[in-house]
Amino acid sequence: MEGERPRSDTVTTTVSSHMETISLGGSIAYDRSFLRSPTGVLLLMEIMFGLLVWALIAGSEYFLFSAFGWVMFVAVFYWVLSVFFFLLHLTRANTRITKVPWSLVGLCFNGSAFVLYLIAAVVEASSVNKDVHQHHNYNSWTASSFFAFIVTVCYALSTYFSFQAWRTKS
């Protein structure tokens, strides 16, 4: 027994997660579980309500007032990026591009969207004036302002979840 080494027990732990995917053909698949996740639900809400924000503004004479041009820019810019990120996560393409720090990208995207949408929503709400503008524009801009604040809350929640994901990966 003198030449024997002390015995060490090795414990191996494996963690598996079930990803429910449906293949739509050759290399395109989508992740159903993403649609049920908080991130997926928030992205869908940001896309739907963001579309309402810029559609309601686009249907009015927003180009006559620079404040509404700013709101339109923020709404369309972040709507396009939200659609991009939604498709990226839905198809799990982000897992195939490993060189990009996706948790940091998500945090920067959602944080900037929250700040700029908050500014745009406040600017839009303060620019709506029933006495000066036509009735149709007033209704559209009021509704758009309401939805802009809803999108702002969605981006704030997304920023929180992105921060949590970034903090756990750092």
UniProtKB/Swiss-Prot annotation:
Residues 1-38, 89-102, 167-170 are cytoplasmic. InterPro entries: MAL, Marvel, MARVEL-CKLF_proteins. The chain crosses the membrane at residues 39-59, 68-88, 103-123, 146-166. Signal peptide: none annotated. It is a multi-pass membrane protein. It comes from the Eukaryota. Pfam families: MARVEL. Keywords: Membrane, Nucleus, Transmembrane, Transmembrane helix. GO terms for biological process: myelination. Residues 60-67, 124-145 are extracellular. Residues 34-167 form the MARVEL domain. One of its GO terms (molecular function) is structural constituent of myelin sheath. This is MARVEL domain-containing protein 1. One of its GO terms (cellular component) is membrane. It is found in: Membrane; Nucleus. It comes from Xenopus laevis (African clawed frog).
